[in-house]
UniProtKB/Swiss-Prot annotation:
Protein name: Inactive protein RESTRICTED TEV MOVEMENT 1
Keywords: Cytoplasm, Lectin, Plant defense
Transmembrane feature ranges: none
Residue ranges annotated for the Jacalin-type lectin domain, each copy included: 1-152
Function of the protein: Unable to mediate restriction of long-distance movement of the pathogenic tobacco etch virus (TEV) without causing a hypersensitive response or inducing systemic acquired resistance.
Main location: cytoplasm
Family to which the UniProt record says this protein belongs: Belongs to the jacalin lectin family.
Quaternary structure, from the entry: Self-interacts. Interacts with RTM3.
Organism: Arabidopsis thaliana
Gene3D superfamilies, A to Z: Jacalin-like lectin domain (2.100.10.30)
GO molecular function, one term: carbohydrate binding
Alphabetized SUPFAM superfamilies for the sequence: Mannose-binding lectins (SSF51101)
């Protein structure tokens, strides 16, 4: 299930590049972020596929005065949400201004910059490991849009009826 993307881009930009990292099994090992006071410049991922580490392409220019690596505790830690802010007006800057990643055990960020003229977004993916990847766009000025993939559950949780039967057998009438 594709969610988003959110963000905005400068209509004057002629270098918009779409990217999609949704074909992976959802196991992210690391996230690499280049950012600064202008916002999120680029994002890159390292996935676990068939027991091997696979590095995605970098999505956006490798500039910005800060660089962060988010390393998840694979296989026990997984993405449960992403939130942030994007600039809603035309400008020659990265419109994705800040990003924060939530997992089942931790919170990473926010990375980038915050401001009162930014719109906020939040994708909450539930407590289960349902994250399926990222997608978005970038141009020469930085990350413009970002979205996520959600893998809906395919199996109902099992209901433990053993305790219910035990409780019923202990009921005494009259």
């Amino acid at each position: 299930m594709k969610i988003g993307p959110v963000g905005k881009h400068d209509a004057r930009s002629t270098t918009i590049v779409n990217w999609d990292e949704g074909s992976h099994d959802g196991f992210i090992y690391q996230i690499f972020l280049s950012h600064g006071v202008a916002g999120i410049m680029s994002i890159q991922f390292q996935f676990v596929m068939d027991g091997k580490l696979v590095l995605s392409d970098r999505h956006g220019p490798c500039s910005g005065d800060m660089f962060d690596v988010i390393e998840l505790n694979y296989p026990h830690e997984y993405i449960t949400g992403i939130s942030g802010e994007y600039y809603k007006y035309e400008a020659n800057i990265p419109h994705m201004r800040s990003l924060k990643f939530n997992t089942n055990t931790s919170e990473y960020g926010p990375f980038g910059t915050s401001g009162s003229s930014n719109d906020k977004f939040a994708f909450k993916l539930g407590k289960s490991p349902q994250f399926g990847g990222f997608h978005g766009t970038y141009d020469a000025s930085g990350l413009q849009y970002i979205g996520v993939y959600l893998r809906p559950k395919t199996v109902l949780p099992k209901i433990d009826t053993g305790n219910a039967e035990e409780t019923e057998s202990k009921i005494v009438l009259g």
